[in-house]
A protein has these predicted regions:
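Disulfide-bonded cysteine-rich modules in secreted/extracellular proteins
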Residues: 725-734
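Short coil/loop linkers at secondary-structure junctions
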Residues: 115-117, 370-371, 438, 627, ...
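Short small-residue beta-strand/loop micro-motif enriched in glycine and branched aliphatics
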Residues: 513-514, 599-603
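Periplasmic/cell-envelope proteins involved in peptidoglycan metabolism and beta-lactam response
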Residues: 1-320, 349, 426-432, 569, ...
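Short, mixed-charge low-complexity intrinsically disordered segments
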Residues: 636, 640-650
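Short, surface-exposed charged micro-motifs
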Residues: 578-580, 730, 745
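Beta-lactam-recognizing serine transpeptidase/beta-lactamase-like catalytic domain environment
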Residues: 2, 81, 87, 216-228, ...
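Substrate-binding beta-hairpin/strand module that engages nucleic acids
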Residues: 383-386, 631-634, 639
Length: 780
């Protein structure tokens, strides 16, 4: 009975449970049915959105694929700037820590193959065990990472080396080091160009980074999606590395000769040279000294010997040495580096001196103000404004009656001032502007100086300013303005825009753009241009020419010397220059050399520049297949050999080999306040060095007495031309022959100082006998 009751109770419980289970099952079924319906609705309405979200959550890895910055080559394909693939060593601590045996094996391999500290790795790993990106070494070459990759590939050791991978990037490299450093520029750590072509063409050289994504797909397989990098374009520059090398070698030789000669520091504050094709505006070479290593632009060794620059951008007399360098704060150091990196040939401004005289003559001839048959009498000075001091010529006794050609040949200031009075302010300013003085040339380089406020206008030019402008004082120019205008002056009058790049190509070598010579205007006629060429030829070969020492043996060239006294007047500091072309009968190239304050006792000597020109052209002209047209006489051969011996002796002794001939010396500088020299930044007036290197200085002065070379006295005392600038006191007597001997070895008559023997110095005549004081100014 009890048993029957128990069975009935169990049966009732089982039935009850079955009913509950059925109800529960139905509820669950209903819930899943509702959930399924909801999912269907969600997928229908928002499926694509949620799919993207899920995929983004499933992303497994991502890395940047760096682009390759474009190359820069010279006109013949020699590589000047390239980008080389390098590798960063990256440690994934989280992966390395997955197994204990991985840690020691991986760290051991790293220290064995790379210059890394084991203690630092372990300390970092302990502090950051989940880190997945720890850079151990940067910018290694493939050869440097190869030993580690071999260890990884080894079956026995490789399985324990985990968590190390190599991040690819590109490193900018300059195969020729410091060659053309001012022109090329360099890149910063973020691959952005600074200075030169690197900055100007940064957008062309830059590419676009690519990306590689990895994620797990629906089948739990790793999927990868890659967006390729787009490499930058390449530049074919107009430079010729062979010509560039010749130029830089000669500038270096000049510095080696005059470094620390009279004062501590480089051979000059700056020395610049530009060589340009006359009929295209293409720059074959552009260099200045000092330069720097493009692969290590922040190496402070290059600053030794450079003048200090203050916070206002003014260049000081103080020279950087080891002691000064060690005491500089970061701001001061960066300021000095910025001055080093700027391109003197386009960023610095200065008064041109007598190199402007051919432009003055051209303005008169082309405008019709001058016929070319005029003559001018030079009595040694000219009173421009009644009651004011006269502006003196280099020869205070006067040059006599001169034609235009003779005035250019002798570099007579008085004759040029009289031409200016005939030409007039409006016409002269018009032609100077036509030659782009006061305007940018728009050369394709970063940092070209603005000079709009560094030249006179009709509002600021009076009679004195007109007079001094005719011979190159009171206004400022850049080297690129001068040589570009000079090319137009002697090529038939055709003004081409100067440029540094002739072609842009893609990474696969296809041509993106050809940059053809751009003819902007004709500034003078063929007839006027031919006359100017004749005038400039006489400067070099004429009996009284000031540029004899620029002529390379066997060639005829034309050109013009220049010497300009810097601000403040009377400081005996000068910018000397020579601007020329070759060959004389059919110009192919123009060359312009500027020496800014040579490190010598007597700076006012154009031969500091002409000798550089001669040494450069002696090598460049044969390289360009421009052949000699003049036979070398025995006398000329002897002169060349003796000049070479004298120069080599000077290199050994450190003596001044400038010669200081009056006829190539200071070319009458006026006392007007003018614009100063080397203005670059924010109107500093002296070597401006603002961050953009494109500042302007004021040109609204130049209104004092206008006398030349400060007060016009003792500017070239006892430095007659015939004897290299030496005086009677410099003569010693050879006891064997009784002849007089000058410090440079030249033999002279001990009583008169006249050169004896067969050696001719090819110098113009002096109006003064040796030992007699010349109180005037030397010609530009």
């Amino acid at each position: 009975m009890d048993r029957e009751r128990k069975e009935k109770r169990n049966n009732r419980f089982t039935t009850k449970m079955q009913k509950k289970l059925v109800v529960l099952y139905l509820c669950v079924l209903l819930a899943f049915t509702g959930l399924g319906a909801r999912l269907i609705l969600i997928n229908r309405d928002n499926g694509e959105q949620y799919e993207k979200q899920v995929l983004s959550q499933q992303q497994y890895s991502s890395r940047t694929i760096p682009y390759k910055r474009g190359e820069i080559t010279d006109r013949k394909g020699t590589k000047l700037a390239v980008s080389e693939k390098v590798y960063n060593v990256v440690l994934d601590c989280k992966l390395m820590n997955e197994k204990e045996e991985y840690v020691d094996a991986t760290i051991s391999a790293l220290t064995q193959c790379f210059d890394v500290d084991e203690g630092e790795i372990r300390s970092y790993n302990e502090a950051n065990p989940d880190s997945q990106y720890y850079v151990l070494a940067r910018q290694l070459t493939y050869d440097e990472i190869a030993p580690f990759q071999e260890l990884e590939a080894d079956e026995e050791t490789g399985r324990y080396i985990q968590g190390v991978w190599f991040e690819e990037e590109y490193k900018r490299n300059y195969p020729l080091g410091s060659l053309a450093s001012d022109v090329i520029g360099f890149t910063s750590s973020d691959n952005v160009g600074s200075y030169g072509l690197e900055e100007y063409y940064n957008d062309e050289l830059s590419g676009t980074n690519g990306r590689e994504y990895g994620y797990m797909n629906d089948d739990s397989n790793l999927e990868r999606t890659t967006k390729a990098a787009v490499d930058g374009n390449n530049l074919v520059s107009t430079l010729d590395v062979n010509i560039q090398s010749i130029v830089e070698d000669k500038l270096q030789e000049f510095n080696d000769t005059y470094k620390d000669a009279v004062r501590e520091g480089n051979g000059a504050r700056n020395v610049g040279c530009v060589i340009m094709e006359v009929d295209s505006g293409e720059v074959l070479a552009m260099a200045s000294y000092p330069n720097f290593d493009l692969n290590d632009p922040r190496n402070t060794d290059a600053l030794i010997g450079q003048n200090m620059v203050d916070a206002d951008g003014t260049v000081l007399e103080e020279v950087i040495n080891e002691a000064a360098l060690s005491s500089m704060d970061d701001d001061t150091l960066y300021r000095q580096l910025n001055y080093l990196w700027r391109n003197y040939c386009i960023s610095n401004t200065y008064e041109p001196g007598s190199t402007i005289k051919p432009f003055t003559a051209a303005a008169g001839l082309e405008s019709g103000a001058l016929s070319g048959n005029e003559t001018y009498e030079c009595a040694g000075s000219l009173t421009v404004v009644a009651g004011e001091k006269p502006i003196k010529c280099h020869n205070v006794y006067g040059d006599g009656v001169l034609t235009i050609s003779q005035a250019i040949e002798r570099s007579c200031n008085v004759a040029l001032m009289k031409m200016g009075q005939t030409i007039g302010e409006t016409t002269l300013l018009k032609y100077l502007e036509d030659f782009n003085f006061g305007l940018k040339t728009n050369i394709d380089l970063a940092g070209e100086a603005r000079t709009a406020s560094l030249v006179f206008t009709e509002d600021t030019m009076g009679p004195t300013e007109l007079a001094t402008t005719t011979f190159g004082q009171g206004f400022n120019v850049t080297m690129i303005q001068m040589i570009t205008g000079f090319c137009a002056l002697i090529n038939g009058g055709y003004y081409y825009e100067p440029h540094m790049v002739s072609q842009i190509t893609s990474s696969d070598g296809s041509v993106v753009r050809n940059i053809e010579p751009r003819l902007l205007k004709q500034v003078v006629s063929e007839e006027t241009s031919a006359k100017i060429r004749d005038y400039c030829l006489q400067v070099v070969i004429g009996e009284n020419g000031t540029g004899h020492t620029a002529r390379p043996a066997g060639y005829l060239i034309g050109g013009k010397t220049g010497t300009a006294e810097t601000q403040p007047r009377g400081n005996n500091e000068y910018v000397v220059s020579f601007m020329g072309y070759a060959p004389a009968d059919d110009p192919e190239i123009a060359i312009y050399v500027v020496v800014d304050r040579p490190n010598a006792e007597n700076q006012d000597d154009a031969k500091f520049a002409t000798r550089i020109v001669r040494s450069i052209l002696t090598e460049v002209l044969p390289y360009l297949d421009i052949f000699m047209t003049e036979e070398l006489s025995e006398e000329e051969q002897q002169e060349l050999e003796e000049a070479q011996i004298a120069y080599e002796q000077a290199l050994v002794s450190g003596n001044d080999v400038s010669g200081n001939d009056a006829d190539e010396n200071t070319e009458g500088s006026s006392e007007e306040t003018g614009t100063g020299t080397d203005g670059g930044a924010e109107g500093s007036g002296t070597d401006g060095t603002g961050p953009e290197s494109e500042g302007e200085s004021s040109a609204d002065s130049g209104t004092t007495d206008g006398s030349s070379d400060a007060d016009g006295t003792d500017s070239s005392s006892e430095t007659p031309a015939d004897n290299g600038g030496y005086t009677m006191d410099d003569i010693t007597i050879d006891p064997e022959t009784g002849e007089g001997v000058l410090p440079d070895g030249t033999r002279v008559d001990p009583d008169t100082g006249e050169v004896i023997g067969n050696v001719e110095l090819n110098l113009p005549e002096s109006n003064l006998p040796l030992g007699e004081e010349d109180e005037g100014d030397s010609p530009f």
